[in-house]
Regions:
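Conserved hydrophobic core/spine positions of the Hanks-type protein kinase catalytic domain
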Residues: 125-129
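Active-site beta-strand termini and strand-to-loop segments that position acidic
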Residues: 42-48, 101-102, 149-150
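Catalytic-loop of the protein kinase fold
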Residues: 132-149
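ATP-binding glycine-rich loop module of kinase domains
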Residues: 24-78
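Juxta-kinase regulatory segment immediately upstream of eukaryotic protein kinase catalytic domains
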Residues: 1-31, 228-234
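C-lobe/activation-segment region of protein kinase-like
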Residues: 149-235
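Conserved structural core of kinase catalytic domains
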Residues: 66-122
């Protein structure tokens, strides 16, 4: 089970923050964004320190699943030591609210990257670092999950579907973890070359391993997008 969070900033009172979160949820105020896990709120404390609070939404099974995803994300952050390119996790409040340090970054699909080679070399190194700690992200192809800081530094967010490597003998976990690692490297190649795999260098090709499950997803996605575009055009 997640451990009780500790607060690094003495200006942030746990009860005060929890009251703020509950009020924000009840009044739908201070909403920063929405995601597949639920709503994201932006808290600004004394001294201007900003925190992101991720909360589950929905009812019944959907709320349970989203809460479990937030719990998994908390476990992933807890597994990782402090490192540049990963948001600092403050804690998991009341078994519902994931509290993270706010990161001033731009999603990669919107960002202007000043030094393409430096950024993607740093991004690759960051992926290798989290893998070395036994965490695979799994969902880096979703461009919202990769931020660009100051036009040059990568930051990985949203570990809700991550896979954490277990100790000891666990064949299923080992398979899932290794598959997720492959997903991460494939995503790095896709983002670096913007999906133009024919331009991939020989050096980078060693990080790309086409997987059947990705091919199936692509086959489903392309017709779906074509239908969606056609329907939007009729409006």
């Amino acid at each position: 089970m997640p451990h009780k969070p500790t607060w690094e900033n003495p200006e942030i009172d746990e009860k005060e923050l929890l009251d703020w979160i509950r009020h924000s949820v009840q009044t739908s105020s201070n909403v920063y964004s929405h995601g597949y896990q639920g709503r994201v709120y932006l808290y600004t404390g004394k001294g201007g320190r900003k925190l992101i609070i991720k909360t589950p939404t929905g009812r019944g099974l959907m709320r349970y699943v989203r809460t479990k995803m937030l719990e998994r994300e908390f476990k992933a952050y807890s597994k990782l030591p402090p490192m540049d390119g990963i948001p600092r996790c403050i804690g998991f409040l009341d078994g519902l609210y994931l509290v993270l340090e706010f990161v001033e970054g731009v999603p990669i699909y919107k960002a202007e990257i000043k030094d393409h080679k430096f950024f993607f070399d740093s991004f690759l190194a960051l992926i290798k670092k989290i893998h070395a700690e036994g965490v695979a992200h799994t969902d880096l192809k979703k461009k919202d999950n990769v931020l660009v800081i100051d036009g040059k530094k990568p930051c990985i967010i949203d570990f809700g579907v991550s896979v954490i490597k277990k100790k000891g003998f666990s064949p299923l976990n080992a398979y899932l973890y290794n598959t997720s690692r492959t997903f991460d490297f494939n995503a790095w190649v896709k983002l670096k070359y913007d999906g133009k795999y024919e331009e991939m260098s020989e050096e980078d090709s060693k990080y790309y391993h086409r997987m059947l499950i990705e091919e199936i997803a692509r086959c489903i996605r392309e017709p779906y997008l074509s239908i969606k575009i056609a329907l939007l055009g009729r409006k």
